[in-house]
Amino acid sequence: MPRKNFKFLINASNLHMGGGVQVAVSLIDELSRMDDLPAGLSVLASDEVHANLQNVNSNCLRFGGYEVFNTYGISTLWSQLDSKASGFDVVFTVFGPLYLRSTCAVNIVGFAQAWIIYPNNEISSSLPFVQRVKKRLKFFVQSLFFRRADRLVVELEHVKIGLVEQGILDADQIDVVHNCLSSVYLQPDHWKPMSVSISKKKFSLGFVGRDYLHKNTNLLPHIKKILNDKHGLDVDFYVTLNPAEWSAKSEFFRGSIRNVGSLKVVQCPNFYQQMDAVIFPSFLECFSATPLEALAMKKPLFASDRRFVRDVCGDFAWYFDPENPITAADLIAGYIKNRAGRDDEQLTAAREFVIKFSNPCQRAEDYLRILQNAAIDCSLC
């Protein structure tokens, strides 16, 4: 058993949007509910993580220390994080890299930067030369900080393989802890409505996520146009972009797609409820919870034919080539005309599959075990 006086720090100060916030909220909330929570466990939460923890009524007073603190990228090197992380045996950054000048603690970092393990991806090759060089430089610098970790934690096996192939860390320094559905999706009493209403006059397809390049959202208006021109189907597409992301989209995009704005974790189930199906056209991921969330809400999922989806969803998703809007439109049209409203049995089976895939409580226990084992191993050195 681990010593009672080990001190652990969960660092979520650098997470401000997207799936990283959801994972951190789920992890911290589950830890707060443990009966045998270590007394020496402290948390640094960003404003966004803290706000979402409040939305799910998490009892953050259960931790030995809890502070709202924000860090942003490489500027963290000049922040107070060094002093706040001092005195701990283990520092676990939910998703890195961790930008610290130095640390005496065991440094464990969550890894979810697919650009580092798949540098020659579709997006990179399509970028202008200068932008491509900037991207490569950015992720090279990030990789240097990931290499400083004592251990990395990843969400799927293909990520571990990629890290080893890129020479980031050895296989025995990398742990796999499957991501999972947030417990929010199993607790309807925690769900909150969106601030905008959605018209249900047409078949509705939803995309949940930020507008990162690899999310491939620019494919959506092309799919919509092909559905209309080729198949005679007027389908509404909804996205969850923040104001800056929305204003940066083309007139073609904004004239074709509807935006409900960014959502809190507790609002996402309501968004899924109002969709007839979910689309996930991403080129590149380590892992994304969106496919799991869609299936858990019993929504048909149209997704990129990529390993990061197939490894999780198996035969429960409808797959298309993310580089080809015609294949996506044909797939969606076939579903609408032949399957829509007549596949409840498959959707129910998909939901049951997702719930069994992994669960938030087990994930939190797995993370905590990694921290405790690292502290014990270090104390024996």
List each model region and its residues:
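Conserved donor-binding/catalytic core segment of Leloir-type glycosyltransferases
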Residues: L9, V196-K215, P221-K224
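Aromatic "clamp/platform" in nucleotide-sugar-dependent glycosyltransferases that forms part
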Residues: F283
